[in-house]
Amino acid sequence: MTITQFKIQKLENFFGSLPKYATEHSAGMDLIAANKQPIIIKIGEIQLIPTGIAIALPDLFEAQIRPRSGLAVKHGITVANSPGTIDSDYRGEIKVILINLGKEDFIIEKGMRIAQMIISKYERILWKESNTLEETVRGSGGFGSTGV
């Protein structure tokens, strides 16, 4: 396994530990809430939660912010723009956009694990305009066309 090192900065409001993998084979690192006061996410409401960190990714890398399954299953708390994308040229604080799809208000306490961050490599492309596309078995079928 290759381990790559990227820079991370603890900001003034940082709390807890740096993002880390929970197990040897985890794809995502937990992000910790760094809010000064508890944040109440009312039913159906969206809140922006600070993490107290900023990162520097090299070109052709991104960070994806994804929900934690436990928060989603137990409380209906998920990442509103899932997956959120942190571009390689962004140097500000990473913040997580959470939405409450649950049945009761939910409180985000300082130090709570609120999301996962996945680091991914990607490719940049150029579009080649065409009047036709290659045929496939699926064709233009979508939105349940292959079965439910």
UniProtKB/Swiss-Prot annotation:
Reaction(s) catalysed by this chain's protein: dUTP + H2O = dUMP + diphosphate + H(+)
Pathway named in the protein's UniProt entry: Pyrimidine metabolism; dUMP biosynthesis; dUMP from dCTP (dUTP route): step 2/2
Functional description taken from the UniProt entry: This enzyme is involved in nucleotide metabolism: it produces dUMP, the immediate precursor of thymidine nucleotides and it decreases the intracellular concentration of dUTP so that uracil cannot be incorporated into DNA.
Enzyme class: hydrolase
GO biological process, one term: dUMP biosynthetic process
UniProt name for this protein: Deoxyuridine 5'-triphosphate nucleotidohydrolase
Binding site for substrate: R68, S69, G70, N81, T85, I86, D87, K95
InterPro entries: dUTPase, dUTPase-like, dUTPase-like_sf, dUTPase_trimeric
UniProt keyword Hydrolase, yes or no: yes
Enzyme nomenclature, EC number: 3.6.1.23
Family statement: Belongs to the dUTPase family.
Organism from which the protein derives: Rickettsia canadensis (strain McKiel)
Required cofactor names: Mg(2+)
Keywords, in A-Z order: Hydrolase, Magnesium, Metal-binding, Nucleotide metabolism
An example molecular function term from Gene Ontology annotations: magnesium ion binding
